From Swiss-Prot:
APOD occurs in the macromolecular complex with lecithin-transport and binding of bilin. Appears to be able to transport a variety of ligands in a number of different contexts. Homodimer. SUPFAM superfamilies: Lipocalins. Glycans are attached at residues 66, 99. It is found in: Secreted. Residues 1-21 form the signal peptide. This is Apolipoprotein D.
Length: 189
């Protein structure tokens, strides 16, 4: 057992260095309840990122996502951000509803060779806000959280943000590292 742990330590140290700034925790992923009676058709359209737990692949501001239905029944995901140099960075992926008994548990994939990542809609009223959670368990010992608070507009009232953060804390999801996404003076993409 000890030699196995010694082999894992460098790998774990590498994971921790890659995950700096991200929400990296001991133990397996929490399993919070998702939005009941989720209707993906009402969810489609443009969402603006209001707050998030920082992720290595989002470096800009004015971050937004646009969801549209594809002919094959999957959901096209187009994420866009404004880079510090003024250029627009975008990435396109697909989301699928793999569990029809829990339609708010989607999976999203941006690259063919990458695994599908969880995309769980914990709460939404479809017209104003959405709370999205993603978590990956790493070798049964650690997990990495991703959280996004989204709005149909670039601004959400503070009481709505507090309500959504309360959902997270009630489900043992750490919100300490959440940051506000700059949505001021943003161009239309």
């Amino acid at each position: 057992m000890a030699p196995t742990l010694l082999l894992l330590l460098p790998a774990l140290a590498g994971l921790i260095s890659v995950a700096q700034g991200q929400a990296f925790h001991l133990g397996r992923c929490p399993t919070p309840p998702v939005q009941e009676n989720f209707d993906v058709h009402k969810y489609l359209g443009r969402w603006y990122e209001i707050e998030k737990i920082p992720v290595s692949f989002e470096k800009g501001n004015c971050i937004q996502a646009n969801y549209s239905l594809m002919e094959n029944g999957n959901i096209k995901v187009l994420n866009q951000e404004l880079r510090p140099d003024g250029t627009v960075n975008q990435i396109e992926g697909q989301a699928t509803q793999s569990n029809l008994t829990e339609p708010a548990k989607l999976g999203v994939k941006f690259f063919q060779l990458m695994p599908t990542a969880p995309y769980w809609v914990l709460a939404t009223d479809y017209e104003n806000y959405a709370l999205v959670y993603s978590c990956t368990t790493i070798i049964w010992l650690f997990h990495m959280d991703h959280v996004w608070i989204l709005g149909r507009n670039r601004y959400l009232p503070p009481e709505t943000v507090t309500y959504l953060k309360d959902i997270l804390t009630a489900n043992n999801i750490d919100i300490e590292k959440m940051t506000v996404t700059d949505q001021v003076n943003c161009p239309e993409f």
